[in-house]
């Protein structure tokens, strides 16, 4: 099979690149091995949350200019970041992932443990604050589904009380939710979202909430609605008498699953091909270019393309792997930026910046991958497979995924 572009990896960066290229009229195929790290998504997208010293960033576009030369943002070019950030927001909203935010100034989202964390874009309806030290309400009621353990209400309440809010924790249930509770494996956020997918179930939830809620400025609920779109989140707001807002839960993330579904739908509408549950396992190189790739489920048929994008993720997604001797990229054995000695991969203190978090595929300034010291002219790397940054310490992971994908897609479309 022959395509214009083949993308290896169906996560945030792979889908972003695929959508952008399909919109430009390219014939695109995405090879996706399985579920991506979007299933751990917070409901927010991060451009740059903390600087290199660990201090919260208020104005990310200004702080990005202080990052090192090997950071993916530096390779993009600091002068392009604002434009690409706007394009990323437009793409998400076009896919149906309704977000709000501003690349010029971070707002603050809530973690599932009640901490406030800098964020660039946040899903509509999720609880945010414009400032780090003020809350938009005084009296808060935190409402949880009975038996749902992935929404630690006591931690959230303690965090809000420290910031001056008067908090009450309450719970509710319905017959449908009570039935789901019989099996602990069914009390995950994504399973609850499926149980509450129809209007009748949603009406029962609203009636329960109206019955137990008191005199609060806002009702904070776990984000367990809207598995495939945001309709139920908005609909519940019209049914409940008090203002409500949603807080993220522990994984799996309903918002992340919904984001993946909506991006895949847009990619399919644009005519893209998605090979789901297949894994790229190698490629043929000739004269400094990648000619074709092979996959586990198509052992007798190579996939050919003019351009290739590696968006396979980091260690969690098996885009990077390691053994006792080395860190390596498993599909093409590309050059990797990593320490040679295993003892240097980690620090003894778990709270220190861990060196392995900055490991990734080595690229040139245009994100061409490098193999055996030589640039591969038609193979690009994007997203969390890239080296040069620590997404946990800098809180820039989703921003790097979105913006590097957009930049590489632009580079490819400008070649013709």
How should these model regions be labeled?
Residues 3-30, 409:
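N-terminal Rossmann-like FAD-binding beta1-loop-alpha1 element of flavoenzymes
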Residues 6-8, 31, 280, 303-313:
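Short hydrophobic core segments
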Residues 33-69, 176-192, 399:
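Conserved N-terminal glycine-rich FAD pyrophosphate-binding loop of Rossmann-like flavoproteins
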Residues 47-131, 139-142, 156-160:
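Dinucleotide-binding Rossmann-like beta1-alpha1 core, especially the glycine-rich loop
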Residues 151-163, 195-218, 225-283, 299:
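Helical element adjacent to the flavin cofactor pocket in flavoenzyme catalytic cores
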Residues 264, 282-302, 308:
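Conserved beta-strand-loop-beta-strand element in the redox core of flavoprotein oxidoreductases
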Residues 299-300, 336-341, 345-391:
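FAD-binding beta-loop-beta segment adjacent to the flavin cofactor pocket
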Residues 318-325, 377, 385-416:
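A conserved FAD-binding loop/helix module that cradles the flavin
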């Amino acid at each position: 099979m022959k395509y214009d572009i083949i993308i290896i990896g169906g996560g945030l960066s792979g889908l972003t690149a695929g959508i952008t290229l399909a919109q430009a009229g390219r014939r695109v195929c995405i090879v996706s091995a399985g579920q991506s790290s979007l299933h751990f998504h917070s409901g927010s997208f991060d451009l740059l949350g903390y600087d290199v010293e660990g201090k919260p960033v208020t104005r990310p576009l200004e702080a990005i200019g202080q990052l090192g030369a090997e950071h993916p943002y530096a390779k993009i070019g600091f002068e392009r970041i604002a434009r690409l950030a706007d394009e990323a927001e437009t793409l998400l909203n076009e896919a149906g992932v309704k977000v709000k935010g501003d690349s010029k100034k971070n707002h603050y989202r809530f973690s599932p443990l009640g901490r406030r964390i800098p964020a660039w874009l946040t899903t509509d309806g999720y609880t945010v604050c414009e400032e780090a030290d003020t809350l938009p309400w005084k009296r808060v009621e935190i409402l949880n589904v009975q038996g749902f353990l992935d929404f630690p209400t006591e931690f959230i309440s303690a965090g809000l009380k420290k910031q001056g809010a008067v908090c009450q924790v309450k719970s509710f249930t319905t017959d449908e939710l009570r039935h789901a509770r019989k099996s602990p494996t069914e009390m995950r956020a994504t399973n609850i979202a499926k149980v509450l997918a129809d209007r009748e179930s949603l009406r029962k939830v609203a009636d329960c909430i109206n019955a137990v809620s008191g005199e609060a400025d806002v009702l904070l609920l776990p984000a367990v609605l809207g598995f495939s779109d945001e309709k139920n989140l908005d609909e519940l707001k019209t049914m409940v008498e008090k203002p409500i807002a949603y807080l993220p839960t522990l994984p799996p993330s309903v918002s992340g699953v919904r984001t993946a579904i909506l991006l895949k739908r847009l990619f399919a509408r644009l005519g893209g091909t998605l090979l789901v549950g297949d894994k790229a396992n190698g490629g043929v190189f000739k004269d400094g270019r990648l000619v074709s790739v092979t996959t586990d489920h198509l052992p007798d048929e190579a996939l050919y393309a003019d351009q290739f994008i590696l968006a396979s993720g980091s260690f969690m997604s098996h885009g990077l792997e390691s053994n006792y001797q080395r860190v390596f990229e498993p599909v093409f054995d590309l050059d990797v930026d990593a320490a040679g000695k295993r003892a240097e991969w980690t620090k003894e203190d778990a709270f220190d910046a861990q060196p392995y978090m900055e490991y990734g595929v080595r690229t040139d300034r245009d994100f061409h991958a490098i193999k055996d010291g030589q640039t591969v002219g038609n193979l690009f790397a994007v997203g969390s497979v890239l080296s040069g940054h620590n997404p946990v310490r800098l809180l820039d992971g989703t921003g790097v995924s979105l913006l590097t994908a957009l930049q590489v897609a632009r580079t490819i479309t400008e070649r013709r």
